[in-house]
């Protein structure tokens, strides 16, 4: 932001969540102090603490509060230990991802000065992963779960790839590439997954033609 203040919603969660969020907010405050900015931190309880108080691990009201903030700091949690969804065990990161449509999982990788690396030229790249589709069973079905076991010895996972999802992740990938070294690699397995990865590759190539 270019303004002199910002607001951030902080979700501590449980386990090492408080430790993680404290370190994150310390870094945030230090960065803002350097540029003579301030931040208002709004803390929300989620996870098991929320489940005990509100019978849900993530209250819907929190999403509305997050809309008014400039960012969200999400602490860690052990959502695999939560009760079923119908008993209030919502995965906070999944709820946030779906509600705000956070489709791009942006992961920079860069070696630091003074640290040795086996790559002579160093590392400075960004991995752009589509975050709303694929094999994960919490995001590949409109209703129900995209995983099933027809027998006790057989498990099946359904993969969901759409033209919309493939196109927009390619678009943001090219946007980042244009602002950096103008190099982009689309990673796929279209030689085997001909329909699903084939559709992704088709979309990535279509987007590339608009950036020539």
Give short role names for the model-derived ranges.
Residues 21-32:
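Short, polar/charged alpha-helical segment
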Residues 37-58:
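N-terminal beta-loop-helix "entrance" segment that forms/cooperates
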